[in-house]
């Protein structure tokens, strides 16, 4: 069974349709896949610990645009590398400017931009070699090398012992060993001289005059007093103009991402307020029985508010008004005669 890990950026949590779409694509390709999802901040802060050699695929979901907004800490890349099995793949919204960090963590960058965990290379094993055994008298024994002592080189000329049978043979051996030593000394002395001559190389001879003639040296953005410019000049050739343009684009990208987050949060708050307005309490005529006594057919708690002050309670809102019928508009027009 294939195990897949979804690493969600915090902004991807607000877009439920995006996460649902990715899960449906996974289920269409791998119906028996075991999908686990975590927010990448919790993994980076080690609140959630991932087990080593567990997941076959890790999919990183980050809806933000721009390489700056998709960068991953090197420590997080190492955690993801350890959680993958051999030949495991990390794919999704990966930053293309962090391929070197991925390679340093152990990944291999694929042709489609995916990061692949390679198989472990087998360790080298040292094989001990047995010494050659020499059979002596039917039994194998380990023999040490034997050495022969050289005779003195200051032998008297013309004085030989004719009684010895092997005198000429010994002289031939001594002469051949002398020649061998002389040839070895001559060989090594000549080779040392040649090495010393080869090691001393003038670096100026490696550069031809044709190449140095057409070199273009960029002009430094410096003021006459030796101080550097704060801003790039009009015809900048030292690269300061490109650095400023990159900084400006990074700032604008960061501002756009912050504004997008603010817009998304404002939309969520507006939706919550609309839902609260839909659930607001509204009263109908039946619910206003104890509130508005002028509605026809409605009576107060004492059922005598319309009869007059003699029948009204102490806290009745109609104290001082003449008797009326329920539903009748009460108007007072006779105050002009008393004035």
Curated annotation (Swiss-Prot):
> What's the encoding gene here?
DRE2
* Ranges spanned by the short sequence motif Cx2C motif 2, renumbered to the chain: 313-316
Q: Where, per UniProt, does this protein localize?
A: Cytoplasm; Mitochondrion intermembrane space
Any keyword ATP-binding?
no
> What quaternary arrangement does the UniProt entry report?
Monomer. Interacts with TAH18. Interacts with MIA40.
Which protein are we looking at?
Answer: Fe-S cluster assembly protein DRE2
Alphabetical GO biological process terms: cellular response to oxidative stress; iron-sulfur cluster assembly; negative regulation of hydrogen peroxide-mediated programmed cell death; negative regulation of nitric oxide biosynthetic process
> Motif Cx2C motif 1 residues?
302-305
Q: What lineage does the source organism belong to? A: Eukaryota, Fungi, Dikarya, Ascomycota, Saccharomycotina
